[in-house]
UniProtKB/Swiss-Prot annotation:
Disulphide connectivity of cysteines: none
Domain ACT: 74-149
InterPro entries assigned: ACT-like_dom_sf, ACT_dom, UPF0735_ACT_dom-cont
Family: Belongs to the UPF0735 family.
NCBIfam families: PRK04435.1 (NF003361)
Name of the protein this chain belongs to: UPF0735 ACT domain-containing protein SAOUHSC_01752
Alphabetical list of Gene3D superfamilies matching this protein: 3.30.70.260
């Protein structure tokens, strides 16, 4: 592949996207859910120029839309070192019906540790946000971060 054809991809939270990009996503959703809606009417409904819509429409995709074929992702959890913490995490993963690809638990230092999980959600419609939310709700989990995903 020629370097000039190579495009980098970034994972970015919606709340930091420019308004025109967020509106483009909303328009794409509206067009997908209502096949009778024209692009002209959709951009008018969301108060976005057609040129802005055309500029972004093929460059922005919700994470879950791109993960439908390959729903593998890696999370890192920052936890307090207590007996059974890994078991609690794995119990949540099991209840969400996810497959564990790899697990790494760091050696605790100053009663803190990290757990890195590579997961596969291919057989389930669970979103990454659902998984992160469920793990964040566990006692003794101070932070959960998405560190990679396959697309």
């Amino acid at each position: 592949m020629d370097n000039k054809d190579y495009k980098k991809f970034y994972l970015i939270r919606e709340d930091v996207l420019p308004e025109s990009v967020v509106k483009t996503l909303k328009i794409k959703d509206a067009l997908k859910s209502d096949p009778t809606l024209s692009i002209y009417d959709a951009v008018k409904q969301f108060d976005l120029s057609r040129s802005a819509f055309y500029k972004y429409r093929e460059t922005i995709f919700p994470v879950d839309d791109k993960m439908l074929d390959h729903r593998e992702f890696t999370l890192i959890l920052y936890v307090t070192d207590i007996v059974g913490m890994l078991a609690r995490v794995l119990d949540v993963i099991s209840k969400l019906e996810l497959s564990v690809l790899t697990i790494h638990q760091s050696i605790p230092m100053e009663e803190k540790a990290t757990i890195t999980l590579s997961l596969n959600a291919k057989s389930k419609e669970t979103s990454v946000e659902d998984v992160i939310g469920a793990l964040r709700n566990l006692d003794y989990v101070s932070k959960v971060e998405l560190i990679s995903m396959s697309m």
